[in-house]
């Protein structure tokens, strides 16, 4: 089951990115005292009281100005809220309640999501309650005074968030239907591939539009399995895109990636893997989606009996961070091998949803440690892995309980991930490893101890 999402919203310069970094225990979100630094939404994993979830950072909301990037920022916030289980509205306790805060609150009342108000910049515990009091008028219950910089009050905020999140064992969506996003640069043959699917399969639902801002889905059925296919906008380099319909179409494509079970990354074999293909592949991995690499226009490529192996080697050299994704060579124009794509989709989705028993995980860890012991510092402190367990699926995610996460460098973390893949498979899906210190439950409740490989 995918991790539940918590959207962090608010007007510019109230400290949203600082709060995200505090909740996720990282510094990935860019922080600057100039409004509008965050434009795209960014996702980070967080952990609190045995619950894993995702926090999404959004740009500052401004409703009365349509200049420059502001419409895009609003669109990003709407997309974040649409996929979130709840939202945290961040306000500035030093500035007090503003007209912009009220305008955002009016908008949130129509979004049908639980809302928690976090009154940031309450650095003084003595004054925090008084600073937060005036935000009762927003109508979202008790406002919580916090300091994102110092961490005070964030434990109470996280407690409130967990109260409102859906139960951990609650199913997310209809797992009998497989969502497939067809993504790639312009003119690589995405629409031709969709048409080829429709020519081969029986369409059982007319194209369904969600809102006017959503991509159009097409549902097909094959061997009693339903697939929801999304043909996304071609994704180009940012400097080649005007801030108009195409720009918003591309952002809807990114949303399609996040809500899909599996992405078909379509590559034009005549062009090879471009820089933009690499960035798109990175987005798929970052969002934790299963993936099949579809190499299109194979009919137009000159070849002999060994060509396919050489071409695959060249493509994989450029897509090394998707080395876990299967690759298939097709021609959407002629239909060559298109029918085999859905077989690959079934396989990778099964791996994406797969669970592994704790005993098996710890057997893999034991073998890995026997082959290569954890590193030791110059002061003689050695890393110790006590045990591991799977915490979620889609993508498969594991928590490793260790004496101190800081003792495990990137090299050893990558080694453990390789051992997981060699022993457990997981073809077609990324995996996540979280490293948690044994004393994490005793530490100050302001920072996340789980770190992603």
Curated annotation (Swiss-Prot):
Domain EngA-type G per the UniProt entry, residue ranges: 4-169, 178-353
Protein residues bound to GTP 2: 184-191, 231-235, 296-299
Pfam families listed in its UniProt record: KH_dom-like, MMR_HSR1
Domain KH-like: 354-439
GO biological process: ribosome biogenesis
InterPro entries attached to this UniProt entry: AAA+_ATPase, G_ENGA, GTP-bd, GTPase_Der, KH_dom-like, KH_dom-like_a/b, P-loop_NTPase, Small_GTP-bd
Keyword GTP-binding: yes
A molecular function (GO) term: ribosome binding
Binding positions (GTP 1): 10-17, 57-61, 120-123
Keyword annotations: GTP-binding, Nucleotide-binding, Repeat, Ribosome biogenesis
The keyword Acyltransferase appears for this protein: no
Subunit: Associates with the 50S ribosomal subunit.
Database matches in PANTHER family: GTPASE DER
Family: Belongs to the TRAFAC class TrmE-Era-EngA-EngB-Septin-like GTPase superfamily. EngA (Der) GTPase family.
The protein's role, per its UniProt record: GTPase that plays an essential role in the late steps of ribosome biogenesis.
Name recorded for this polypeptide: GTPase Der
Organism of derivation: Synechococcus elongatus (strain ATCC 33912 / PCC 7942 / FACHB-805)
């Amino acid at each position: 089951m995918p991790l539940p999402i918590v959207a962090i919203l608010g007007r510019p310069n109230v400290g949203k990115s600082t709060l995200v970094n505090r909740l996720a225990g990282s510094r990935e979100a860019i922080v600057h005292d100039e409004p509008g630094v965050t434009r795209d939404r960014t996702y980070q994993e967080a952990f609190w009281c045995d619950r894993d979830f995702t926090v999404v950072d959004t740009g500052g909301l401004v409703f009365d100005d349509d200049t420059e990037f502001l419409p895009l920022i609003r669109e990003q916030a709407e997309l974040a809220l649409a996929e979130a289980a709840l939202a945290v509205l961040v306000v500035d306790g030093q500035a007090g309640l503003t007209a912009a805060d009220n305008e955002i609150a009016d908008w949130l009342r129509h979004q049908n999501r639980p809302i928690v108000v976090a009154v940031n910049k309450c650095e003084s515990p003595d004054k925090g309650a008084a600073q937060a009091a005036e935000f009762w008028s927003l109508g979202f219950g008790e406002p919580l005074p916090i300091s994102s910089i110092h961490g005070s009050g964030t434990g109470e905020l996280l407690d409130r968030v967990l109260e409102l999140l859906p139960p951990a064992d609650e199913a997310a969506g209809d797992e009998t239907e497989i969502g497939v996003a067809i993504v790639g640069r312009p003119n690589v043959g995405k629409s031709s591939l969709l048409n080829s699917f429709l020519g081969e399969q029986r369409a059982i639902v007319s194209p369904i539009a969600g809102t006017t801002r959503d991509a159009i889905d097409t549902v097909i059925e094959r061997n009693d399995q339903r697939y929801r296919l999304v043909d996304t906008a071609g994704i180009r380099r940012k400097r080649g895109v005007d801030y108009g319909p195409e720009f918003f179409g591309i952002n809807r494509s990114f949303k399609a990636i996040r809500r899909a079970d599996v992405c078909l990354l379509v590559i034009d074999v005549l062009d090879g893997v471009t820089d933009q293909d690499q960035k798109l592949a990175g987005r798929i991995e970052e969002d934790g989606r299963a993936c099949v690499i579809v190499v299109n226009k194979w009919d137009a490529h000159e070849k002999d009996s060994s060509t396919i192996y050489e071409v695959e080697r060249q493509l994989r050299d450029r897509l090394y961070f998707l080395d876990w994704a299967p690759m298939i060579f097709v021609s959407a124009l002629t239909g060559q091998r298109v029918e085999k794509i859905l077989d690959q989709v079934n396989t990778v989705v099964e791996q994406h949803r797969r669970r592994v028993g704790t005993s098996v995980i710890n057997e893999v860890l034991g073998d890995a440690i026997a082959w290569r012991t954890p590193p030791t510092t110059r002061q003689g402190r050695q890393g110790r892995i006590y045990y591991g367990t799977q915490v979620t699926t889609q993508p498969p995610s594991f928590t490793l309980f260790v004496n101190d996460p800081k003792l495990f460098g990137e090299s050893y973390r990558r080694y453990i991930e390789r051992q997981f893949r060699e022993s457990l498979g997981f073809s077609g899906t990324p995996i996540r490893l979280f490293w948690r210190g044994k004393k994490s439950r005793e530490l100050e409740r302001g920072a996340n101890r789980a770190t992603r490989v």
